[in-house]
A protein has these predicted regions:
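Serine-hydrolase catalytic machinery in alpha/beta-hydrolase-like enzymes
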Residues: 7-94
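Gly/Ala-rich beta-loop-alpha elbow adjacent to hydrolase catalytic centers
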Residues: 105-113
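Short, conserved loop/helix-junction motifs that constitute active-site signature segments
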Residues: 42, 123, 146-150
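Alpha/beta-hydrolase fold nucleophile elbow
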Residues: 95-106, 128
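Phosphate/oxyanion-binding active-site loops and adjacent basic polyanion-contact surfaces
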Residues: 76-84, 108, 171-172, 201-202
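Conserved hydrolase catalytic core segment
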Residues: 115-126
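The feature captures the conserved acid-bearing segment of alpha/beta-hydrolase catalytic domains
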Residues: 132-213
Length: 217
């Protein structure tokens, strides 16, 4: 794992290969290492990278919105989207040019990955993955109908996530299926039903998403 500072962000990357998977899961070093360890055994042609530090409710939310129990999403995603061309260029300088780029996120990071795929026009961007993604985010499905995603889309969700006591989050399964139907109009979409709840086997879920997108499995 290589760690470095670039563009005002802390960054980390590991692996080598012509496929880049950018991870959006809160800039957690241990989680990144776990995902990288799995991919090192199964997906040798992938460079895994991420950047932070991250405030989930600010940086991964595409617009301002109110959650439950006073939670506030401040809509800072566009700042990170604007950084994507720069970090890809810097990673290309360090690791060589990438023929394919994928965006892979967890929870609100999954929402951010799909949002970025819808608004970022980049020739090498081939798709995105949302694992246990916050598809319940206010206004998201309406936005997606007007801003199509292309390429490959991987969606996964834990079977118990719909049992959340939070009424907004409890709609996640219904909303994820709605996102699947919308995205299928313009993209190749795969959905995987995972066992457990929102925090079950997170590294494995993210690694499976990368493996699918990078055609390692």
């Amino acid at each position: 794992m290589t760690e470095f500072e670039f563009g005002g962000f802390s960054c980390r990357a590991e692996g080598s290969g012509g496929t880049l998977a950018l991870l959006f899961s809160g800039f957690d070093r241990e989680l990144f290492a776990d995902v990288g360890g799995i991919l090192a055994q199964s997906c040798g042609g992938v460079t895994l990278a991420e950047f932070g530090d991250i405030d989930w409710d600010r940086d991964y939310s595409p617009w301002e919105a109110a959650g439950t129990n006073g939670r506030v999403f401040s809509g800072g995603a566009d700042r990170l989207v604007g950084f994507l061309p720069d970090i890809v260029q810097e990673l290309s300088r360090r690791y060589g040019e990438f023929s394919r780029v994928y965006l892979c996120g967890y929870s609100l990071g999954g929402l951010f990955a799909l949002y970025s795929a819808a608004v970022w026009d980049f020739p090498a961007l081939c798709g995105a993955a949302s694992c246990s993604g916050s598809m319940w985010f206010p206004g998201w499905t309406e936005f997606l109908r007007e801003h199509p995603i292309h390429g490959d889309v991987f969606l996964s969700l834990g079977g118990k996530e719909k049992n959340s006591p939070d009424p907004m989050m409890a709609s996640v399964e219904e909303k994820t299926m709605e996102v699947k139907r919308i995205a299928e109009r313009t993209a190749h979409v795969v959905f995987r039903n995972e066992p457990g709840g929102h925090f079950s086997r997170v590294p494995q879920r993210l690694a499976r998403a990368v493996e699918y997108l990078a055609e390692c499995k």
